[in-house]
Design a protein with these regions (language model features):
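Parallel beta-helix/beta-solenoid
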Residues: 55-57
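Short, T/G/N/S-enriched strand-turn elements that build extracellular solenoid repeat scaffolds
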Residues: 15-28, 37, 41-51, 64-71, ...
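Conserved long hydrophobic alpha-helices within structured protein cores
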Residues: 6, 97-103
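Short amphipathic alpha-helical segments that mediate assembly, nucleic-acid/protein binding
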Residues: 6-10, 19-21
Length: 141
């Protein structure tokens, strides 16, 4: 089995999210990468695969527009600001947690086809929320 190279993973995440490597920490005991205090530019389709490859935890980040319709490992957001749309839809699958964050525009979960086992969205400030036609087994809002 190939040994995990955390430095290469940090470089890969930094490149795909277009952020500085020093903003990323690897938390070994939980096998996640914590991304701190940065602005995430728009995530283009080719680079969204970063969410499939790594467990990511965003802390105090600004995120412009994020549409998730793929299978992810796990995503956590705490004290983040979503400047535009945050949408979960269609073929989304995985674990997601969003806490103590601000959504300046749209937040939506629609047409999720697979049974999603955990979506945790709590203690946030929303402007516009739409949730309909989903298969979510454990949803905390």
């Amino acid at each position: 089995m190939e040994e995990f190279d955390k430095e290469q993973a940090i470089a890969d995440i930094a490149e795909k999210l277009n952020i500085q490597k020093d903003k990323i920490l690897y938390i070994e005991y939980s096998d996640l990468f914590q991304i701190n205090d940065c602005v995430i530019p728009a995530v283009i389709a080719d680079n969204i695969k970063v969410f499939q490859e790594y467990n990511l935890y965003f802390y105090r980040c600004t995120i412009p527009n994020l549409i998730l319709e793929i299978t992810i490992k796990s995503l956590e957001f705490k004290m983040c600001c979503f400047e535009s749309s945050f949408i979960i839809r269609n073929n989304f699958d995985g674990y997601i947690s969003i806490q103590d964050s601000i959504f300046e525009k749209d937040f939506g979960i629609f047409w999720v086809k697979k049974e999603v086992y955990k979506i945790n969205v709590c203690k946030n400030i929303f402007k516009d929320v739409s949730i309909f036609e989903n298969k979510i087994l454990n949803f905390n809002f």
